[in-house]
Amino acid sequence: MSTARTENPVIMGLSSQNGQLRGPVKPTGGPGGGGTQTQQQMNQLKNTNTINNGTQQQAQSMTTTIKPGDDWKKTLKLPPKDLRIKTSDVTSTKGNEFEDYCLKRELLMGIFEMGWEKPSPIQEESIPIALSGRDILARAKNGTGKSGAYLIPLLERLDLKKDNIQAMVIVPTRELALQVSQICIQVSKHMGGAKVMATTGGTNLRGDIMRLDDTVHVVIATPGRILDLIKKGVAKVDHVQMIVLDEADKLLSQDFVQIMEDIILTLPKNRQILLYSATFPLSVQKFMNSHLQKPYEINLMEELTLKGVTQYYAYVTERQKVHCLNTLFSRLQINQSIIFCNSSQRVELLAKKISQLGYSCFYIHAKMRQEHRNRVFHDFRNGLCRNLVCTDLFTRGIDIQAVNVVINFDFPKLAETYLHRIGGSGRFGHLGLAINLITYDDRFNLKSIEEQLGTEIKPIPSNIDKSLYVAEYHSEPVEDEKP
Protein backbone atom coordinates (compact mmCIF):
# COMPACT_ATOMS: atom_id res chain seq x y z
CA MET A 1 0.00 0.00 0.00
CA SER A 2 1.31 3.42 -0.90
CA THR A 3 2.05 5.75 1.94
CA ALA A 4 1.32 9.42 2.33
CA ARG A 5 4.95 10.30 1.65
CA THR A 6 4.48 9.66 -2.06
CA GLU A 7 5.31 12.83 -3.96
CA ASN A 8 2.27 12.53 -6.21
CA PRO A 9 -1.11 12.73 -4.47
CA VAL A 10 -2.08 9.10 -3.95
CA ILE A 11 -5.71 8.06 -3.90
CA MET A 12 -6.05 5.02 -1.70
CA GLY A 13 -8.97 2.69 -2.36
CA LEU A 14 -12.02 4.03 -0.57
CA SER A 15 -13.27 1.80 2.20
CA SER A 16 -16.88 0.67 2.07
CA GLN A 17 -17.13 0.51 5.87
CA ASN A 18 -19.05 3.61 6.98
CA GLY A 19 -20.25 6.56 4.99
CA GLN A 20 -17.00 6.70 2.99
CA LEU A 21 -18.23 4.58 0.11
CA ARG A 22 -16.36 3.87 -3.11
CA GLY A 23 -16.76 6.27 -5.98
CA PRO A 24 -16.25 9.96 -6.64
CA VAL A 25 -17.34 12.71 -4.31
CA LYS A 26 -20.68 14.22 -5.27
CA PRO A 27 -20.24 17.56 -7.01
CA THR A 28 -21.94 20.36 -5.11
CA GLY A 29 -22.02 23.82 -6.57
CA GLY A 30 -23.59 26.85 -5.04
CA PRO A 31 -23.72 30.58 -5.11
CA GLY A 32 -21.40 32.81 -3.15
CA GLY A 33 -17.66 32.93 -3.05
CA GLY A 34 -17.21 29.96 -5.33
CA GLY A 35 -17.84 26.28 -5.00
CA THR A 36 -16.82 22.91 -6.32
CA GLN A 37 -16.92 23.16 -10.03
CA THR A 38 -19.61 21.57 -12.13
CA GLN A 39 -18.63 19.30 -15.02
CA GLN A 40 -19.53 22.13 -17.36
CA GLN A 41 -17.11 24.48 -15.57
CA MET A 42 -14.38 21.85 -15.55
CA ASN A 43 -14.79 21.31 -19.29
CA GLN A 44 -14.46 25.07 -19.70
CA LEU A 45 -11.19 25.03 -17.78
CA LYS A 46 -9.88 22.21 -19.95
CA ASN A 47 -10.25 24.49 -22.96
CA THR A 48 -8.11 27.24 -21.45
CA ASN A 49 -4.41 27.94 -21.32
CA THR A 50 -2.43 27.47 -18.12
CA ILE A 51 -0.15 30.38 -17.29
CA ASN A 52 2.69 30.61 -14.78
CA ASN A 53 1.70 28.95 -11.53
CA GLY A 54 -1.25 26.92 -12.71
CA THR A 55 -3.83 29.70 -12.87
CA GLN A 56 -6.22 29.38 -15.75
CA GLN A 57 -6.46 32.16 -18.32
CA GLN A 58 -8.87 32.16 -21.22
CA ALA A 59 -7.17 31.11 -24.45
CA GLN A 60 -9.49 33.34 -26.42
CA SER A 61 -11.87 35.94 -25.09
CA MET A 62 -15.38 34.60 -25.15
CA THR A 63 -17.85 36.85 -26.85
CA THR A 64 -21.55 36.25 -26.89
CA THR A 65 -23.64 38.22 -29.32
CA ILE A 66 -27.06 38.97 -27.86
CA LYS A 67 -29.42 40.99 -29.98
CA PRO A 68 -31.64 43.57 -28.29
CA GLY A 69 -34.89 41.99 -27.23
CA ASP A 70 -33.48 38.46 -27.08
CA ASP A 71 -34.26 36.51 -23.93
CA TRP A 72 -30.56 36.25 -23.12
CA LYS A 73 -31.09 34.12 -20.03
CA LYS A 74 -32.22 31.25 -22.25
CA THR A 75 -28.72 31.08 -23.73
CA LEU A 76 -27.05 30.54 -20.35
CA LYS A 77 -25.41 27.24 -19.49
CA LEU A 78 -26.49 27.01 -15.86
CA PRO A 79 -25.03 24.48 -13.42
CA PRO A 80 -27.42 22.09 -11.64
CA LYS A 81 -29.57 23.93 -9.10
CA ASP A 82 -28.24 23.68 -5.54
CA LEU A 83 -31.11 22.18 -3.55
CA ARG A 84 -29.34 21.98 -0.19
CA ILE A 85 -30.74 23.83 2.80
CA LYS A 86 -29.04 27.15 3.61
CA THR A 87 -28.83 29.04 6.91
CA SER A 88 -29.63 32.69 7.52
CA ASP A 89 -25.90 33.48 7.12
CA VAL A 90 -26.67 33.70 3.41
CA THR A 91 -30.47 33.76 3.15
CA SER A 92 -31.20 36.76 5.40
CA THR A 93 -31.18 39.25 2.54
CA LYS A 94 -33.12 42.34 1.47
CA GLY A 95 -34.43 40.50 -1.58
CA ASN A 96 -32.24 42.25 -4.15
CA GLU A 97 -31.35 40.74 -7.52
CA PHE A 98 -28.01 40.98 -9.33
CA GLU A 99 -29.79 42.84 -12.15
CA ASP A 100 -30.70 45.61 -9.69
CA TYR A 101 -27.08 46.84 -9.75
CA CYS A 102 -27.11 47.74 -13.48
CA LEU A 103 -24.23 45.39 -14.23
CA LYS A 104 -23.02 44.65 -17.75
CA ARG A 105 -25.01 41.84 -19.32
CA GLU A 106 -21.83 39.89 -20.05
CA LEU A 107 -20.90 40.04 -16.37
CA LEU A 108 -24.40 38.94 -15.35
CA MET A 109 -24.07 35.94 -17.65
CA GLY A 110 -20.89 34.86 -15.88
CA ILE A 111 -22.50 35.38 -12.47
CA PHE A 112 -25.50 33.21 -13.29
CA GLU A 113 -23.39 30.52 -14.94
CA MET A 114 -21.43 30.26 -11.68
CA GLY A 115 -24.72 29.24 -10.05
CA TRP A 116 -24.99 32.49 -8.09
CA GLU A 117 -28.73 33.09 -8.19
CA LYS A 118 -29.20 36.02 -5.79
CA PRO A 119 -26.81 38.24 -3.81
CA SER A 120 -25.88 37.08 -0.30
CA PRO A 121 -26.05 39.61 2.58
CA ILE A 122 -22.38 40.64 2.23
CA GLN A 123 -22.86 41.02 -1.53
CA GLU A 124 -25.98 43.16 -1.06
CA GLU A 125 -24.07 45.46 1.27
CA SER A 126 -20.81 45.61 -0.70
CA ILE A 127 -21.63 45.70 -4.40
CA PRO A 128 -23.47 49.04 -4.68
CA ILE A 129 -21.00 50.82 -2.38
CA ALA A 130 -17.97 49.42 -4.19
CA LEU A 131 -19.49 50.44 -7.54
CA SER A 132 -19.75 54.01 -6.25
CA GLY A 133 -15.98 54.10 -5.68
CA ARG A 134 -16.09 54.42 -1.90
CA ASP A 135 -13.66 52.62 0.44
CA ILE A 136 -15.13 49.68 2.35
CA LEU A 137 -14.31 48.06 5.70
CA ALA A 138 -16.35 44.85 5.79
CA ARG A 139 -16.60 42.34 8.59
CA ALA A 140 -18.28 39.12 7.50
CA LYS A 141 -17.94 35.43 8.16
CA ASN A 142 -15.85 33.24 5.93
CA GLY A 143 -17.95 31.21 3.53
CA THR A 144 -20.71 33.79 2.99
CA GLY A 145 -19.82 35.08 -0.47
CA LYS A 146 -17.04 37.60 0.17
CA SER A 147 -15.19 36.80 -3.05
CA GLY A 148 -18.25 37.63 -5.11
CA ALA A 149 -18.80 40.77 -3.03
CA TYR A 150 -15.59 42.34 -4.32
CA LEU A 151 -15.02 40.55 -7.65
CA ILE A 152 -18.35 41.65 -9.14
CA PRO A 153 -17.80 45.42 -8.70
CA LEU A 154 -14.12 45.01 -9.57
CA LEU A 155 -14.98 43.43 -12.93
CA GLU A 156 -17.81 45.88 -13.62
CA ARG A 157 -15.44 48.83 -13.25
CA LEU A 158 -12.77 47.50 -15.63
CA ASP A 159 -12.12 49.43 -18.83
CA LEU A 160 -11.12 46.69 -21.26
CA LYS A 161 -10.02 49.25 -23.86
CA LYS A 162 -7.03 50.02 -21.64
CA ASP A 163 -4.13 47.60 -21.41
CA ASN A 164 -2.85 48.37 -17.90
CA ILE A 165 -3.37 46.85 -14.46
CA GLN A 166 -6.56 48.39 -13.04
CA ALA A 167 -7.27 46.24 -9.97
CA MET A 168 -5.35 44.12 -7.48
CA VAL A 169 -6.57 41.52 -5.01
CA ILE A 170 -4.08 40.69 -2.24
CA VAL A 171 -4.55 37.43 -0.29
CA PRO A 172 -2.35 35.80 2.38
CA THR A 173 -1.89 32.32 0.87
CA ARG A 174 -0.99 30.87 -2.50
CA GLU A 175 -3.93 28.46 -2.50
CA LEU A 176 -6.39 31.30 -1.91
CA ALA A 177 -4.82 33.29 -4.75
CA LEU A 178 -5.36 30.41 -7.17
CA GLN A 179 -8.92 29.92 -5.96
CA VAL A 180 -9.89 33.59 -6.31
CA SER A 181 -8.27 33.85 -9.74
CA GLN A 182 -10.23 30.86 -11.03
CA ILE A 183 -13.48 32.38 -9.76
CA CYS A 184 -12.58 35.72 -11.36
CA ILE A 185 -11.82 34.08 -14.72
CA GLN A 186 -15.06 32.11 -14.69
CA VAL A 187 -17.23 35.12 -13.77
CA SER A 188 -15.59 37.30 -16.45
CA LYS A 189 -15.56 34.71 -19.24
CA HIS A 190 -18.24 36.48 -21.33
CA MET A 191 -16.70 39.94 -20.98
CA GLY A 192 -14.61 39.73 -24.13
CA GLY A 193 -11.03 40.13 -23.06
CA ALA A 194 -10.73 40.60 -19.30
CA LYS A 195 -7.19 39.45 -18.51
CA VAL A 196 -6.68 37.96 -15.05
CA MET A 197 -3.33 36.89 -13.62
CA ALA A 198 -2.37 35.16 -10.38
CA THR A 199 1.14 35.55 -9.04
CA THR A 200 2.43 33.95 -5.85
CA GLY A 201 5.70 33.13 -4.17
CA GLY A 202 7.21 29.73 -4.83
CA THR A 203 6.66 29.95 -8.59
CA ASN A 204 8.84 30.96 -11.54
CA LEU A 205 9.49 34.71 -11.37
CA ARG A 206 10.59 34.78 -15.01
CA GLY A 207 7.20 33.42 -16.08
CA ASP A 208 5.46 36.24 -14.20
CA ILE A 209 7.72 38.84 -15.81
CA MET A 210 6.94 37.49 -19.29
CA ARG A 211 3.21 37.42 -18.54
CA LEU A 212 3.25 41.06 -17.46
CA ASP A 213 4.70 42.03 -20.83
CA ASP A 214 1.23 41.30 -22.21
CA THR A 215 -2.03 42.97 -21.20
CA VAL A 216 -3.15 42.25 -17.63
CA HIS A 217 -6.20 43.98 -16.14
CA VAL A 218 -6.51 42.20 -12.77
CA VAL A 219 -3.69 40.84 -10.60
CA ILE A 220 -4.45 38.44 -7.76
CA ALA A 221 -1.36 37.99 -5.63
CA THR A 222 0.31 37.21 -2.36
CA PRO A 223 2.00 40.27 -0.80
CA GLY A 224 5.69 39.44 -1.15
CA ARG A 225 5.54 38.46 -4.82
CA ILE A 226 3.56 41.48 -6.05
CA LEU A 227 5.81 43.90 -4.12
CA ASP A 228 8.85 42.24 -5.71
CA LEU A 229 7.34 42.68 -9.19
CA ILE A 230 6.45 46.32 -8.44
CA LYS A 231 9.98 47.11 -7.21
CA LYS A 232 11.47 45.50 -10.32
CA GLY A 233 9.33 47.83 -12.44
CA VAL A 234 7.60 44.86 -14.06
CA ALA A 235 4.16 45.29 -12.48
CA LYS A 236 3.18 48.87 -13.31
CA VAL A 237 0.52 49.92 -10.82
CA ASP A 238 0.19 53.65 -11.54
CA HIS A 239 -3.27 53.06 -13.08
CA VAL A 240 -4.64 50.79 -10.34
CA GLN A 241 -8.03 52.14 -9.28
CA MET A 242 -9.01 49.42 -6.79
CA ILE A 243 -7.11 47.23 -4.33
CA VAL A 244 -8.80 44.50 -2.28
CA LEU A 245 -7.36 43.05 0.93
CA ASP A 246 -9.04 39.68 1.46
CA GLU A 247 -8.41 38.17 4.92
CA ALA A 248 -7.22 41.62 5.98
CA ASP A 249 -6.50 40.59 9.57
CA LYS A 250 -3.82 38.17 8.34
CA LEU A 251 -2.47 40.58 5.71
CA LEU A 252 -2.04 43.26 8.36
CA SER A 253 -0.50 40.97 10.96
CA GLN A 254 3.16 41.28 11.91
CA ASP A 255 4.13 38.91 9.07
CA PHE A 256 2.83 41.13 6.27
CA VAL A 257 1.99 44.62 7.53
CA GLN A 258 5.19 46.34 6.35
CA ILE A 259 4.88 44.75 2.91
CA MET A 260 1.29 45.98 2.68
CA GLU A 261 2.34 49.49 3.68
CA ASP A 262 4.98 49.44 0.94
CA ILE A 263 2.45 48.24 -1.65
CA ILE A 264 -0.06 50.97 -0.77
CA LEU A 265 2.63 53.66 -1.15
CA THR A 266 3.17 52.64 -4.79
CA LEU A 267 -0.50 53.14 -5.75
CA PRO A 268 -2.25 56.31 -6.95
CA LYS A 269 -3.58 58.47 -4.13
CA ASN A 270 -7.15 58.28 -5.42
CA ARG A 271 -7.27 54.46 -5.40
CA GLN A 272 -10.18 52.65 -3.76
CA ILE A 273 -9.43 50.23 -0.91
CA LEU A 274 -11.73 47.35 0.08
CA LEU A 275 -10.94 45.45 3.30
CA TYR A 276 -12.66 42.15 4.09
CA SER A 277 -12.08 40.14 7.24
CA ALA A 278 -13.84 37.96 9.80
CA THR A 279 -11.95 39.63 12.66
CA PHE A 280 -10.69 43.20 13.06
CA PRO A 281 -7.70 43.40 15.42
CA LEU A 282 -5.96 46.67 16.30
CA SER A 283 -3.64 46.38 13.27
CA VAL A 284 -6.61 46.62 10.91
CA GLN A 285 -7.97 49.68 12.70
CA LYS A 286 -4.57 51.36 12.49
CA PHE A 287 -4.29 50.64 8.76
CA MET A 288 -7.83 51.91 8.20
CA ASN A 289 -7.10 55.20 9.97
CA SER A 290 -3.96 55.72 7.87
CA HIS A 291 -5.14 54.75 4.40
CA LEU A 292 -8.93 54.56 4.05
CA GLN A 293 -10.93 57.69 3.26
CA LYS A 294 -14.29 57.83 5.06
CA PRO A 295 -14.83 54.08 4.61
CA TYR A 296 -18.29 52.56 4.51
CA GLU A 297 -18.36 50.07 7.39
CA ILE A 298 -20.20 46.76 7.07
CA ASN A 299 -20.65 44.46 10.05
CA LEU A 300 -22.48 41.18 9.51
CA MET A 301 -20.96 39.48 12.54
CA GLU A 302 -23.65 39.27 15.21
CA GLU A 303 -22.00 35.97 16.06
CA LEU A 304 -18.59 34.73 14.95
CA THR A 305 -19.21 31.09 14.05
CA LEU A 306 -21.20 29.91 11.03
CA LYS A 307 -24.76 28.99 11.97
CA GLY A 308 -24.71 25.77 9.97
CA VAL A 309 -21.72 24.26 11.80
CA THR A 310 -22.42 21.96 14.77
CA GLN A 311 -19.44 21.70 17.14
CA TYR A 312 -18.49 18.75 19.37
CA TYR A 313 -15.48 17.71 21.44
CA ALA A 314 -14.22 14.29 22.52
CA TYR A 315 -11.86 13.85 25.48
CA VAL A 316 -9.00 11.53 24.51
CA THR A 317 -5.40 10.79 25.40
CA GLU A 318 -2.74 11.40 22.76
CA ARG A 319 -2.44 7.65 22.17
CA GLN A 320 -6.19 7.31 21.60
CA LYS A 321 -6.44 9.95 18.86
CA VAL A 322 -5.89 7.72 15.83
CA HIS A 323 -8.33 5.11 17.17
CA CYS A 324 -10.89 7.86 17.80
CA LEU A 325 -10.40 9.17 14.26
CA ASN A 326 -10.93 5.68 12.86
CA THR A 327 -14.16 5.41 14.84
CA LEU A 328 -15.36 8.74 13.46
CA PHE A 329 -14.60 7.60 9.91
CA SER A 330 -16.62 4.43 10.46
CA ARG A 331 -19.66 6.20 11.93
CA LEU A 332 -19.91 9.52 10.10
CA GLN A 333 -21.34 10.04 6.63
CA ILE A 334 -18.43 12.02 5.22
CA ASN A 335 -18.62 13.64 1.81
CA GLN A 336 -15.19 15.28 2.21
CA SER A 337 -13.29 16.07 5.40
CA ILE A 338 -10.41 18.34 6.41
CA ILE A 339 -8.29 17.17 9.36
CA PHE A 340 -6.02 19.71 11.08
CA CYS A 341 -2.71 19.10 12.84
CA ASN A 342 -0.47 21.66 14.53
CA SER A 343 2.78 20.83 12.68
CA SER A 344 3.96 19.69 9.26
CA GLN A 345 5.59 16.59 10.75
CA ARG A 346 2.35 15.51 12.44
CA VAL A 347 0.45 16.09 9.18
CA GLU A 348 2.66 13.59 7.33
CA LEU A 349 2.57 11.04 10.15
CA LEU A 350 -1.22 11.20 10.43
CA ALA A 351 -1.73 11.02 6.67
CA LYS A 352 0.37 7.85 6.63
CA LYS A 353 -1.72 6.35 9.48
CA ILE A 354 -5.00 7.18 7.71
CA SER A 355 -3.75 5.56 4.49
CA GLN A 356 -2.73 2.46 6.44
CA LEU A 357 -6.26 2.28 7.86
CA GLY A 358 -7.48 2.00 4.26
CA TYR A 359 -8.98 5.45 3.73
CA SER A 360 -8.47 7.86 0.87
CA CYS A 361 -6.10 10.62 2.02
CA PHE A 362 -4.08 13.57 0.73
CA TYR A 363 -1.93 15.91 2.82
CA ILE A 364 -0.68 19.47 2.40
CA HIS A 365 1.59 21.77 4.41
CA ALA A 366 3.84 24.80 3.91
CA LYS A 367 7.10 22.85 3.59
CA MET A 368 5.97 21.11 0.40
CA ARG A 369 7.03 22.36 -3.03
CA GLN A 370 4.54 24.85 -4.47
CA GLU A 371 3.96 22.69 -7.55
CA HIS A 372 2.96 19.77 -5.33
CA ARG A 373 0.74 21.97 -3.14
CA ASN A 374 -1.09 23.26 -6.21
CA ARG A 375 -1.72 19.73 -7.46
CA VAL A 376 -3.03 18.47 -4.11
CA PHE A 377 -5.30 21.51 -3.71
CA HIS A 378 -6.67 21.15 -7.25
CA ASP A 379 -7.31 17.41 -6.96
CA PHE A 380 -8.96 17.64 -3.54
CA ARG A 381 -11.14 20.56 -4.66
CA ASN A 382 -12.28 18.50 -7.64
CA GLY A 383 -13.30 15.55 -5.49
CA LEU A 384 -10.52 13.06 -6.26
CA CYS A 385 -10.05 12.30 -2.57
CA ARG A 386 -12.29 12.33 0.52
CA ASN A 387 -9.88 13.31 3.30
CA LEU A 388 -7.23 16.03 3.49
CA VAL A 389 -4.77 16.34 6.39
CA CYS A 390 -3.21 19.78 6.69
CA THR A 391 -1.76 22.55 8.83
CA ASP A 392 -3.29 26.00 9.25
CA LEU A 393 -1.98 26.81 5.78
CA PHE A 394 -5.35 25.57 4.55
CA THR A 395 -7.65 27.60 6.80
CA ARG A 396 -7.92 31.01 5.16
CA GLY A 397 -10.89 31.44 2.87
CA ILE A 398 -10.50 28.11 1.11
CA ASP A 399 -13.90 27.31 -0.38
CA ILE A 400 -14.59 23.63 -1.00
CA GLN A 401 -18.32 23.20 -0.62
CA ALA A 402 -18.20 19.39 -0.68
CA VAL A 403 -16.51 19.46 2.76
CA ASN A 404 -19.08 18.64 5.43
CA VAL A 405 -16.77 17.54 8.28
CA VAL A 406 -13.78 19.29 9.88
CA ILE A 407 -11.77 17.46 12.54
CA ASN A 408 -9.25 19.17 14.82
CA PHE A 409 -6.92 16.21 15.42
CA ASP A 410 -4.76 18.74 17.28
CA PHE A 411 -6.74 21.47 19.05
CA PRO A 412 -5.56 25.02 18.22
CA LYS A 413 -4.34 27.47 20.84
CA LEU A 414 -5.94 30.61 19.38
CA ALA A 415 -9.64 31.39 18.98
CA GLU A 416 -8.95 33.03 15.62
CA THR A 417 -7.30 29.84 14.33
CA TYR A 418 -10.23 27.75 15.56
CA LEU A 419 -12.71 30.07 13.85
CA HIS A 420 -10.97 29.79 10.48
CA ARG A 421 -10.55 26.03 10.77
CA ILE A 422 -14.18 25.16 11.44
CA GLY A 423 -15.21 27.56 8.67
CA GLY A 424 -13.97 24.88 6.28
CA SER A 425 -17.35 23.17 6.69
CA GLY A 426 -20.72 24.86 6.42
CA ARG A 427 -19.60 26.99 3.45
CA PHE A 428 -22.14 29.41 1.98
CA GLY A 429 -24.88 28.66 4.49
CA HIS A 430 -24.71 24.88 4.21
CA LEU A 431 -24.54 22.42 7.09
CA GLY A 432 -21.32 21.06 8.55
CA LEU A 433 -19.77 19.31 11.50
CA ALA A 434 -16.68 20.30 13.53
CA ILE A 435 -15.21 17.69 15.88
CA ASN A 436 -12.37 18.47 18.29
CA LEU A 437 -10.12 15.84 19.87
CA ILE A 438 -9.29 17.29 23.29
CA THR A 439 -6.48 16.08 25.55
CA TYR A 440 -6.00 16.96 29.21
CA ASP A 441 -3.67 19.81 28.23
CA ASP A 442 -6.27 21.26 25.84
CA ARG A 443 -9.08 21.65 28.36
CA PHE A 444 -8.29 25.27 29.30
CA ASN A 445 -7.96 26.28 25.64
CA LEU A 446 -11.35 24.73 24.94
CA LYS A 447 -13.03 26.80 27.63
CA SER A 448 -11.18 29.96 26.60
CA ILE A 449 -12.11 29.62 22.93
CA GLU A 450 -15.76 28.99 23.80
CA GLU A 451 -15.82 32.20 25.83
CA GLN A 452 -13.97 34.33 23.27
CA LEU A 453 -16.17 33.24 20.38
CA GLY A 454 -19.39 33.17 22.38
CA THR A 455 -20.13 29.68 21.10
CA GLU A 456 -20.92 26.29 22.61
CA ILE A 457 -18.81 23.20 21.90
CA LYS A 458 -20.77 20.20 23.18
CA PRO A 459 -19.57 16.76 24.28
CA ILE A 460 -19.84 14.36 21.36
CA PRO A 461 -22.91 12.08 21.58
CA SER A 462 -22.77 8.34 20.88
CA ASN A 463 -24.76 8.91 17.69
CA ILE A 464 -24.64 12.14 15.69
CA ASP A 465 -27.84 13.08 13.90
CA LYS A 466 -27.07 13.02 10.18
CA SER A 467 -29.53 15.84 9.56
CA LEU A 468 -26.99 18.16 11.25
CA TYR A 469 -24.40 17.77 8.52
CA VAL A 470 -25.64 15.63 5.61
CA ALA A 471 -27.14 17.73 2.84
CA GLU A 472 -29.43 15.01 1.47
CA TYR A 473 -31.52 15.11 4.64
CA HIS A 474 -32.60 18.66 3.81
CA SER A 475 -32.53 18.88 0.02
CA GLU A 476 -35.54 20.63 -1.37
CA PRO A 477 -37.72 18.42 -3.59
CA VAL A 478 -37.42 19.13 -7.28
CA GLU A 479 -40.74 20.38 -8.57
CA ASP A 480 -42.26 18.35 -11.38
CA GLU A 481 -42.10 20.19 -14.65
CA LYS A 482 -45.44 21.06 -16.09
CA PRO A 483 -46.16 19.60 -19.54
UniProtKB/Swiss-Prot annotation:
Residues 1-40 are annotated as: Disordered. It is found in: Cytoplasm, P-body; Cytoplasm; Nucleus; Cytoplasm, Cytoplasmic ribonucleoprotein granule. ATP binds at residues 140-147. Its main location: cytoplasm. The modification Phosphothreonine is found at residue 36. Its EC number is 3.6.4.13. Sumoylated. This is Probable ATP-dependent RNA helicase DDX6.
